[in-house]
Curated annotation (Swiss-Prot):
ATP binds at P86, L87, K88, S89, G90, L91, S92, S93, S94, S95, A96. It is an enzyme of class 2 (transferase). This is Shikimate kinase. One of its GO terms (cellular component) is cytoplasm. It comes from Methanococcus vannielii (strain ATCC 35089 / DSM 1224 / JCM 13029 / OCM 148 / SB). Its main location: cytoplasm. It catalyses: shikimate + ATP = 3-phosphoshikimate + ADP + H(+). Keywords: Amino-acid biosynthesis, Aromatic amino acid biosynthesis, ATP-binding, Cytoplasm, Kinase, Nucleotide-binding, Transferase. Belongs to the GHMP kinase family. Archaeal shikimate kinase subfamily. The gene is aroK.
Amino acid sequence: MRCSAISPGSGTIINAISTGKGSAFGIDLKIKANVELKNDGKSKINGILLDNPSLKPNLVERCVKNVLEHFEVDYSAKISTSSELPLKSGLSSSSAASNAAVLATFGALGEKIDSELILDLAIKSSFEEQLTITGAYDDATASYFGGITVCNNLERKILKKDVFKEELDVIILMPNFKKNLNVKRMKLISDYVELAFEKCMNADYYKALFLNGILYSSALNFPSYISVDALEAGAVTAGLSGTGPSYIALSYQENTEKVKNAFKKYGTVIISKPDNFGSKIIY
């Protein structure tokens, strides 16, 4: 009983920590999970992160465990993951890993694909591993379905789905900044994040992303001028992704190299595309 699945990461349009409502979009950088099950009655689960074998695979092991417990089977399992996403960077690597792990386990069991249940089990696993504050329903759904999702994270409801109407590149900056999770400061800006969220509900995603980035970078002591540098170089929008430290910019292809050059003085730059396809079983 084997299966492999892939899930893309996501970029932030609105970070949900401040208000409980958020939005994200799929990015074409994926995590692949390979699951092999054995009907031996031992319930032994072993995982490995192939790109970072020294790191503990607790999240993906937890995902497999929760799926097997849900279906009340005592199989043993092996799970391995490989990733195009940098870890702990604000690009939803945890959501992508949990989605891929849960989906691959469903596939290995031969169970019917139930999107709501898959998302619930993936988010449950992230909560149990203390990797999320709000449940990250916006990140999880953008990774699972692809495209743009706008969500009430607290109620686990998708308020709207969309895609970018234009052909865009995603330019990702990974600066050497220390991550900062000051929830109290993020809550202080909730009234202003609400204004950015209204832009998002009105499909003004570029303005929403930029405003959100300025607000959260200020609250978390990341430089906001990096986003302005990207705009100056021709990006249609730019901002902090998640709680950082990564920044994302969206650009038409003719300006991508200029935006990349504006970003690269601050750290490593990756060029990607929006992902509108989401998670899927590949074999």
